[in-house]
Amino acid sequence: MKKILLKQKSKEIYSAEFEILENDSVIGQVFIKGKLGSMEAIVDGTFHNKNFSLKFSNKILTGSSKKFRPYNIIENENITGEIFQTVFRKNLFSKYEYIKCNYNEEKFKLYSIWFGDKQVCAIYKNDIQISQIEFSNVIYNDLHDYTIYIKDDDNIFISILLNYYLYVVEKFKPGVKVTKSVVKYYQKDSNKDLISKYNSDWISKCGLNE
């Protein structure tokens, strides 16, 4: 199992910068840029000499499931996949949001689950968990750090992409001036189907102890 750290170096009014680290060595960098009057952003990054981008898609969305805030995955100027938010609706009274990704003809899902003062994200490929994202709910000066635990090397890149999409749709606020601050997030999910996506023993069973 691999442990990857996404460490935010800076946050300006319309931009943010991250480093991707493994064993304290920088293996990639990411620059996120927003603009006035828009909640969307462009993500440009490098990972092991691979250049990639996430860009908001303006295409008309079709299909049986609703798609929100769709982004294209771009590598070497070619679109290789898409990431978007959608809703799972079990019945009239039971639903939850999650993130879906189609990449290189494979399907991935990210479930973000809140347990009060703890938020955990479980990433699945074909209904099998492949990685888990953990991070602090206490944020200083709007700088966010993420730790990704990844079972197999083949899923490192897609897990990183999903993490940056998560940051854009949840935490990135273009146009907001950065000040010295401490923010504590608190939220509690009650949907049993969503909560069931989290396995508290997954990291230890995969062979990596925190």
Regions found by a protein language model. Name each.
Residues 1-210:
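Intrinsically disordered, low-complexity proline/glycine-rich segments
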